[in-house]
């Protein structure tokens, strides 16, 4: 869990993904379209992939990826991020991290 918390604080917006996950890609594109350059951690390329997945689940992710952190705090997965975007509450959160 310490590794995940450390990784989630490396940048203002951090996304844990898997390279083969289309939902992860969609979330990445959304943030890039908003003008944010998120830190991407492709956990399937990390030797500790299983431990990272378990830690993300313990933090409250219903699915391990994509897991989005803004300002070091877990926002959620695709559903939460898209809901925030549609309700116009995502942009104020990422405003400090715009490129």
From Swiss-Prot:
One of its GO terms (biological process) is cellular response to nitrogen starvation. InterPro entries: GlrX-like_pln_2 (IPR011905), Glutaredoxin (IPR002109), Thioredoxin-like_sf (IPR036249). The keyword Ligase does not apply. GO terms for cellular component: cytoplasm; nucleus. Its main location: cytoplasm. It comes from the Eukaryota. GO terms for molecular function: 2 iron, 2 sulfur cluster binding; metal ion binding. CDD domains: GRX_GRXh_1_2_like. Keywords: 2Fe-2S, Cytoplasm, Iron, Iron-sulfur, Metal-binding, Redox-active center. [2Fe-2S] cluster binds at residue 21. May only reduce GSH-thiol disulfides, but not protein disulfides. Belongs to the glutaredoxin family. CC-type subfamily. This is Monothiol glutaredoxin-S11. The gene is GRXS11.
């Amino acid at each position: 869990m310490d590794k995940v918390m450390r990784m989630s604080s490396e940048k203002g917006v951090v996304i844990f993904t898997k390279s083969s996950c289309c939902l992860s890609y969609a979330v990445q594109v959304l943030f890039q379209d908003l003008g944010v350059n998120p830190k991407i951690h492709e956990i399937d390329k990390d030797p500790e992939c299983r431990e990272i997945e378990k830690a993300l689940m313990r933090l409250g992710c219903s699915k391990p990826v994509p897991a989005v952190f803004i300002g070091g705090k877990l926002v959620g997965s695709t559903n939460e991020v898209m809901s925030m975007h549609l309700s116009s509450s995502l942009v104020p959160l990422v405003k400090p991290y715009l490129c």
